[in-house]
Structures are given as C-alpha cells and as structure tokens.
Amino acid sequence: LVRSRGLGDVYKRQSVFKNFGTAQVKYKDIEVEFVGARRESYTHDSRKPIVEDGTLCDDQNRRDFTINALAICLNKEHFGELIDPFNGMEDLKAGIIRTPLDPDITFSDDPLRMMRAIRFATQLEFSIEKETFSAIERNRKRIEIISKERIIDELNKIVTSSKPSTGFILLDKSKLLPLIFPELNALKGIETIDGRG
C-alpha cells in the first residue's frame, strides 16, 4: 500500500512483527498499524482468546465497542469507503459507548472490556449505553479473572484523564470499585481521616 501510493521514504520506516501478524508504518508523527482480520473464541475461565485467521466481518464482530469496529476499504474499487456494520460512526458522533454484539457475551468473554468501557467514557466524555452499562453490573464479578497489572493499567488511564472523577463514579455505580479497589471503596462517605479532610 505504501509503495503503491508513492511514499517510498515511508516504506523505509516500516516494521513487521511476524509473531503477532502485524506491520507498522511511521509517517511524520503518525503511526499506523496493520493487522490481518481475525476471529476469536474464548473459554469461560480465561480472557485469553483462541485466535484464528478470519474475515473482515469476523474481525468487526470481535471488537469491544461499535466505535472500534469501523473499517476503511483499501481495495482499489472502493478505496476509502467506510465499512460500519454496527453504526459506530453514529455512536461516535453521539458520544455513546456500546458493544457491537450482546454486551453480556462481550464482557463475559473479556472482562477487561468493562474497565475499557468506563475508561473510554471517562477519556472521551462519552456516555455508556444503558444495556451496555447494565451488562457491566451483571458481569462485574468476571473481573476477578483479570490480572492486577491489566486492571492497574486501565485505572492509570482513568486517573490521568481530564476528569477522573467520572471514571470513579462509573466504577462505583457499576459495583466494580469494591472488586478492583476495595481500599478506596472502604473510604466512601468518610470526610476526614486522622483529622484531615
């Protein structure tokens, strides 16, 4: 693609990661990563998927949120055409976080997606669609199969957002907070500790 567009100098700044089946091109301050279409399946006791080659449709179906299931056609006949089977562009414009498929399946398959929903809502100042949020509440105990490191990574992204309180309010309302940060949850309602407030 890079060579066909006459961007020879960019071609020199490409990286191929064969183990992951990805390639990356750097152009000025932009990094673009290319990944082949994949299909995933999960076992109930793990969030690590079994990954196989798949179609674009398979790949879009496995995405966490509609706003992350957008694709652009690179074929010559339809170059640049948006492929948006879940109306992700509408959700992007409306500021809504929603899963492309049944949210109970989405969050049960990969419980970290519950944290990602809250993180995206916090960072982007979006709202979480009602049924998607209800599914977070219903599946919250599945977060226990996620490593602390992955949870901390999402918490750090919430804390460094422009309004982290939004994330903590959503974590509290979804009842995820006592599961991932029981010490903070225990402080709820306390105005002073050791005379400090």
Give residue spans per PLM region.
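Catalytic cores of the polymerase beta-like nucleotidyltransferase superfamily
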Residues: S4-G197
